[in-house]
Amino acid sequence: MQILAISKPRNIEEAQLLRSHHELRARVFSDRLGWEVNVVGGCESDTFDDLQPTYILAVSSNDRVVGCARLLPALGPTMVANVFPSLLSAGHLNAHSSMVESSRFCVDTFLAESRGDGSIHEATLTMFAGIIEWSVANRYTEIVTVTDLRFERILARVGWPLQRIGEPRPIGATVAVAGTLPAKADTFMRLRPANYRSQIISTFGQSA
């Protein structure tokens, strides 16, 4: 399994990986979680996909997308600020140039991959490491996101606790919470699985 960061696809292979990631989002958010999201032709997307985000993809050895997340600069339009302001205690996001938003995080939990820390899926840890690696490589120090309480517990369990920036509130069928996560080299080194590989150019002594 390796991590890729794709903004604009440079070739047919990257274009296919992006399509596969939209298909994964449809399976997870629409089919499994039952969210009211826009699915066309088996692919989930929204208006934030039109803002030239960077997609972090975890790709298996057989070129299957097994995890994904979407990253956008927090100073621009974001889901947390524009869709979920009710989750912010101040009513607005105190964004800065070193903050990036992570949204549409999901992992194909049906894959028969090994598990990492305890019962945490290896693909989940790989995605955490990939998001941090890309953020540090691009001089972001803080990641803002909206998640649910179950996933907040997973973050705490692996030693990457969410710093809440508002109280949890019901959003649809779940209880959501907004918060920030530090993007730090030592966190990356601690979370990455032993067989972690990526194509992100970073400062961690590897060619990503």
From Swiss-Prot:
Catalytic activity: a fatty acyl-[ACP] + S-adenosyl-L-methionine = an N-acyl-L-homoserine lactone + S-methyl-5'-thioadenosine + holo-[ACP] + H(+)
Single GO MF descriptor: N-acyl homoserine lactone synthase activity
One record GO biological process: quorum sensing
Database matches in Gene3D superfamilies: 3.40.630.30
Keyword terms, alphabetized: Autoinducer synthesis, Conjugation, Plasmid, Quorum sensing, S-adenosyl-L-methionine, Transferase
EC number(s) reported in the record: 2.3.1.184
Signal peptide bounds: none
Superkingdom assignment: Bacteria
Matches recorded under PROSITE patterns: AUTOINDUCER_SYNTH_1, AUTOINDUCER_SYNTH_2
Family annotation (Pfam families): Autoind_synth
Database matches in InterPro entries: Acyl_CoA_acyltransferase, Autoind_synth_CS, Autoind_synthase
Disulfide linkage: none
Keyword Ligase: no
Family: Belongs to the autoinducer synthase family.
Function: Required for the synthesis of OHHL (N-(3-oxooctanoyl)-L-homoserine lactone), an autoinducer molecule which binds to TraR and thus acts in the control of conjugal transfer.
Matching NCBIfam families: PRK13834.1
Name recorded for this polypeptide: Probable acyl-homoserine-lactone synthase
Source organism per UniProt: Sinorhizobium fredii (strain NBRC 101917 / NGR234)
Gene of this entry: traI
